[in-house]
Amino acid sequence: MNPYQRASPRTASPASNLQTNPTRTNNPRHSADRNSYFDNPPYNDRGSEDGEDDMASRGDHMAETDQRQYQKINQVIQNFFTKSALSIVSSRVILPTSFNKNGDIRQNKWFNVILDDSDELQLRLTEWKTMDAMAGQHPPLYIEVYLDISGLGHKQSLVVHDEDGKRWDVAAALNAAQPTSRASSRPARPTQIVIERWKIYVGDIDSVHPSDLTEPLPNVYKKAVVLFRGLYANLRLLPAFKYNKSMAKQPANHTSLKLNYRILNGASERPQLDTLSLPLCPSTDPITETAHIGSTNSPIGPLCISVEYRDACEFSVEDSESLLSDQFMGLDDTYLEQKPRAAAPVPGSLPVDKLNTQETPDVGQAYGSLSTFHQVGPPTGTSPISALRAARDMPSSSPIETPPQKLPPNHRTAQGSKSSLRSNDTSSFQRRTSVSFQPFKAGSLSSSPAPGPAGPASPSSSLGRPTSAFGRNINIVPNSLNQPRNRTSLNALPQAALRAPSLPNDNAIASSASSSPKPAPITRYSSSFGHRRGKFSTGGSKTEEDALSSGKGSATSSLQRGSDTLNDGEGGSSGEMRSEDDNISDFLKLLEAKKDLKSFNRSDSSTRDATMRKTTAQLGKYQRMRDSHAQLSDSVSSSTMLHRSSSSSSRQLSSVPAMIHGTSISTASSPGKPISPHTPHTPAIPSRLSANSIIEYDQPHRSRNHRSRSRSGRTARGQGPENLEEQSEVEDDAAGIDIPLSPRPWNYQRRSSSVAQQNRNLPEDEPDMFGVRAASLPVEEGDRARDLHRITSTDLTSSGLFAQTESLASASRDNQAPDDGDSRDDLPRASSTSNTPAKRGTYSSNLRGRGGFFSQGSSTTGSTGGTSSTERQSRYNFNSRAANLDDDEPLLFQMSEIGAGGSRRSLEEARGGSSTGSARGRNSPWGGR
């Protein structure tokens, strides 16, 4: 049996022939109307082979399968449009959610991206949800994201910030772009600014290879999943998404514009004005950018998504008044930049070929408040704004032709120090520094002004607040007025000008009757604050000085009408300030060719005398301040050194406080230099005295109070009135330290120092030579015994023995003189040979109160006497002064006479030679009997 014999009838059947059956859908006559996707169906539909009775049912089944495939392709394309719109709009706008039958939020899960669905958006996308894409009905879908300013209040404006941070009004840009072609029917004002425009469309089928159009539908779906993931990421990288997030973070009470959207068909009519590409602010960058998100192939062609978006989306809602203020500031900026300015010249450049060199002064020099305005050019007004406006109206012609002058230095370019800017070639209206002075020290002559032929400066102008010279034109100033001016301070003035100021010279003002100007002062002291009135301290009111220093008395605050100059009234008497006309005398010099103003020409003798007196008083005041502050400086430094000297001396006198006056022991000083009470007793040059100044304490401890009582009861004997002055000089020479006091011809009442009245026990090393003795003991016998004890002392050194012997010999010669002490038996006596200070004696209060050296006169320098010292001993006698008042004894020693008769001795040698000091004490009022 041949199996092919059974199949032959079926093959011969006309119904089974695909090429001849006209009822079949796969007839070649209909191939042009059919999609190529159905020529090779993705799913294999095997027909029934039961017989010819099943041919009709099998044809109906293939038609149903093709219809189902057709619907699936349309469904994929429709969801591609709707899911793209949902992804875009949901990332820009908060959509109302929709719910299913169970009450749950309905979600869209197409293309493996889960998003909350919204009925509102689906209603707007009805056209694309019902389109027959296979039939060619697939219009492009446009989604525009925009801002609408119609919802803002009347005081609110939408602004956009450029890359420099400047704000620009969006409404102004929209109004400027509004078409004005229709005059009769005026169109509505545009209020929407488009941020993004999305386009979802089917691309050209011819741009895709035919093999890509026949891909199975599952592959088309999978490729679309990748495209939507890329769309989801790109949506969050664009500027509109950042703006939407920033608006979501704003508080509820903050006014902000939300993004809106609209769905447009590509074939529908668009608004007349496309605001997507409308420039909102001046910029060189492109306004919009276009991005192609991607495409995926489908049986009807490539499915594409693209976007055109605005690059600058820094929008905000601002107050209209604040925006208007910014616009005014912008106008000011453009106003200052309207006229191009040439490069500012520097000093020393080539001559200028035009006359008016200050026609357009440097704007950078205009600074300060409205009442204190300074610039390098002429004073053109009372505020920077009015000055800048008046700068354009300055005259450019001059009635006098003079050789071209050098330009003033531009302080923007010449950044040197003040000293480097001092030049003799600067012009008359150059900005100058203010006069400064230091009242504590006298100024040096190194910075004195250059000598001029006219002598010192005229004191007619204020020296405390120097004048400032402003002028219209440098070339209208005569050559006699173009004198070099140095910026000089008050402490650098010549001494001759400080002591004897000359009479003021008249200002150089051109008179209407004469063309020759009056002589002008050569040297002036000028300042950048010269428009203020000069301030003196000769009894003027404090209120006026404060007003001047704060700028209230600025000369630029009063502009005289019709005179083009500044005037502030007439001057006063000699105790008041002179008129401010003198402060702007330099400006008047430049008005040579104009009408003579009598108010500026004050040359009467009363004005000159008043000015001279005020200037002299001012200079004398600071000259006196110099001396007082110099003494104050020296006193401060001396007190610092005194503390250090007292601290070092207190180590030797441990029981006495270091800072109590009188406890600091000095062993040497510079001869010939008076030492003040605050001068530290420190030897300037090391000597033998300072090298051997440690005191050895080996004497018994005694009370000061007891010793002072015994001294006050003694009387000086053996001294005549003619020896009082000589003895005081010896005591001056024998003293260990200089305690200067002002010399007085008589005693003065002085209270005893509280420190001197304290009863303290001194260390044992301070020997009491005459403090404790019986009142009935003869003076001569006690002194002889004490002298013998001194000479025969075992611890006496050789130098001390020689000093004691010399002192005893000198005392014996003095005893040969007639004893005139009977006339002074009632005087109190005190011992200066004692090594301890007197506490309650006759002169103890003066010693302790003045911070002087306690009484170590003969003991400290006991061997310094000599014949010459004895002759000088009576310059200031103690007994002659103590006769008037017990508690008043100012000591005045002469440091220049220490060491004149012999060499200095140390404290050890002085203590060893105490017997010699006692021998001398017989003829001395300090230890005489």
Curated annotation (Swiss-Prot):
Bias-annotated ranges (Polar residues): 8-29, 368-385, 412-437, 476-487, 551-566, 749-761, 830-847
Location(s) in or outside the cell: Cytoplasm; Preautophagosomal structure
Keywords: Autophagy, Cytoplasm, Protein transport, Transport
GO biological process: mitophagy; piecemeal microautophagy of the nucleus; protein localization to phagophore assembly site; protein transport
Compositional bias per record (Basic and acidic residues), positions renumbered to this chain: 55-66, 600-612
Record GO terms (molecular function): protein kinase regulator activity
Pfam families per record: ATG13
Composition skew (Basic residues), residue ranges: 702-714
Gene3D superfamilies xrefs: 6.10.140.1900, HORMA domain
GO CC annotations, alphabetized: Atg1/ULK1 kinase complex; autophagosome; cytosol; phagophore assembly site
Keyword Calcium: no
UniProt entry tagged with the keyword NADP: no
Low complexity composition bias: residue spans: 635-656, 855-871, 912-929
Region of interest (Disordered), residue spans: 1-66, 342-487, 503-581, 600-770, 808-929
Chief location category: cytoplasm
Biased composition (Acidic residues): 723-735
Function: Activates the ATG1 kinase in a nutritional condition dependent manner through the TOR pathway, leading to autophagy. Also involved in cytoplasm to vacuole transport (Cvt) and more specifically in Cvt vesicle formation. Seems to play a role in the switching machinery regulating the conversion between the Cvt pathway and autophagy. Finally, ATG13 is also required for glycogen storage during stationary phase.
Subunit structure: Interacts with ATG1 to form the ATG1-ATG13 kinase complex.
Entry similarity comment: Belongs to the ATG13 family. Fungi subfamily.
Name of the protein in its database record: Autophagy-related protein 13
